[in-house]
Design a protein with these regions (language model features):
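Short, well-ordered alpha-helical microsegments
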Residues: 113, 139-141
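Conserved beta-strand elements of beta-rich interaction domains across eukaryotes
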Residues: 73, 95-97, 135-137, 159-162
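Well-ordered alpha-helical segments embedded in enzymatic catalytic cores
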Residues: 87, 111-118, 168
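RNase H-like DDE catalytic core and adjacent DNA/metal-binding regions
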Residues: 1-96, 105, 121-128, 140, ...
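Short beta->alpha junction loops
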Residues: 103-108, 159
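Domain-scale segment recognizer with a strong primary affinity
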Residues: 3-9, 21, 33, 46, ...
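Short small-residue beta-strand/loop micro-motif enriched in glycine and branched aliphatics
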Residues: 97-102, 155-157
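Short catalytic-loop micro-motif centered on adjacent basic/acidic residues
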Residues: 102, 129-133
Length: 236
């Protein structure tokens, strides 16, 4: 049983590489607890939750607000193993939790803008607003002009907490990548991006009570809105 659970834990399932509670529905709790105690991948990257308070973000529809950020993988061994790729551009729809990720060799304004243009082509809609921190790649004149031409209002976060939704996604996605790197004893994180993204998009999100792919469906928009606002009320 232990071997079966640990094997299932690292497959391409929505609950793969997640917390124990995600796999409780598939196996008895006591069996999961016992099996994952022996898993080096689970134990090493186990998340230690701490109480945090964030200002609530009110969104009422899909494509109302995007948040973007850049994740750094700049240690020498990671750069060498990934053929020069050092950054990951990430963007999330705050309402549906749909996300897009792009590995980059540099974080110059032109590179980031190309990634963002591809996101707009992929999702088929433009966001009304974009929120980010003050990273130079996101506040350059060229990117600002592009957003203005597309009537996307860009505003910056100056607080220490920055943009909590994309920051939370970044932590989740990095943890998935590092667990896969540990599983395969490899520094080549770029080869696991698609696999990690597939797991994230099909995984049930605690706030909206469904996966991002399900939340993207038009018929689910009222349900997502109800769950999101109910969750905000709990935090107040």
């Amino acid at each position: 049983m232990d071997e079966e659970i640990n094997t299932r834990y690292v497959e391409n399932k929505p609950y793969s590489f997640g917390g124990k509670y995600r796999i409780y529905k598939a196996y008895a709790k006591k069996d999961v607890d016992k099996a994952l105690q022996k898993s080096d991948i689970y134990s090493r990257f186990k998340q230690h939750r701490r109480a945090k308070s964030f200002s609530p973000i009110y969104v009422y529809r899909k494509r109302e607000l995007f948040q973007s950020d850049t994740v750094f993988f700049t240690t020498p061994e990671l750069v060498e193993a990934n053929h020069g790729y050092k950054y990951l551009f990430t963007t999330i729809d705050v309402f549906t939790k749909m996300a897009w990720v792009y590995p980059m060799k540099d974080n110059k304004c032109k590179t980031v803008m190309t990634c963002f243009q591809d996101i707009l082509r992929t999702c088929g809609d433009k966001p009304e607003r974009l929120n980010s921190d003050r990273g130079s790649e996101l506040v350059c004149k060229q990117f600002a002009t592009f957003l203005k031409d597309n009537k996307i209002h860009h505003y910056l976060s100056y607080s220490l907490r920055k943009c909590p939704v994309i920051e939370r996604f970044n932590l989740t996605f990095q943890r998935l990548l590092y667990k896969m790197m540990k599983q395969h004893n490899s520094y080549e994180w770029t080869q696991f991006v698609d696999r990690a993204m597939n797991i994230y998009l099909n995984r049930r999100h605690r706030t909206i009570k469904m996966s991002p792919l399900e939340a993207e469906k038009d018929e689910n928009e009222p349900i997502v809105r109800r769950h999101s606002l109910r969750n905000i009320e709990k935090l107040r």
